[in-house]
Amino acid sequence: NDPIHRRVLDILPNRKKECLIQYYSYCKNRHSVEFVISDMYEPYLLVTQIMFPKAKYVVDRFHYITYIMDALDGIRIRQQKEYNEKSREYKLLKNKKNVSLLRKYSNDIDWWVYTKRYKNGHMVDVLPIDVLNEILTISQDLKEGYYLKEKFLDIIRHDEMMNVEEQFDNWINNCIEKNIPEFIEASKTIF
C-alpha cells in the first residue's frame, strides 16, 4: 500500500513466505527501508528480517487492539456462562449495546446523553455511566479487564510517545499482577 497517496500498489497471489521473498527480491531500495508496518502474521516478521535487514518491524496497532478487545470479550463470555440465561447479569453481559459500551474507549463516549433501556420490564432513560457501572459490578475480573483495556488505549492513543516502552512494561506487569488469564495471554503479544 501507498499510505501517502492512499492506493494499493500490488496484490500478491498468496502470503506465503516464499512468495513474499521472491516479490521483495525485486525491491531495489530494500536495504535502506527503515520501517515495515504489518500485522502479527509470523511469516511477515521472518520475511522482514530476511529482506529488510535494517528495518524495524512495527505491528499495526489495530492488531494489538484486537487482542485486547478479544481478552475483554473472553472475560465477559466467561462470566456470562456463570449465570442463568434469565438472570439480570446474563442479560446485561449478553446485550449488544452493553457489549459495545464495554468495548468503546471511554474518551469516545458521550457520558451525559440518555439512552432508552429496558429495566425491570419498563423503558427508562439511563446514562451510559450508570449502565457501565452496573455491568462492572457483576465481576471483579470484568472490572479489572475493563480498566486494563482503558489503560492500554490510553497508552496507544496518546500523542506523545515518550516513555511508551516503560508504560507498556507497567501495563504488562499490571496484567500479570491482576492474574486474569485472558489479559495475561494478550499481554504476551506486546514486545
Indicate where each model-derived feature is located.
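Short alpha-helix plus adjacent loop in nuclease-associated cores
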Residues: Y64-E85
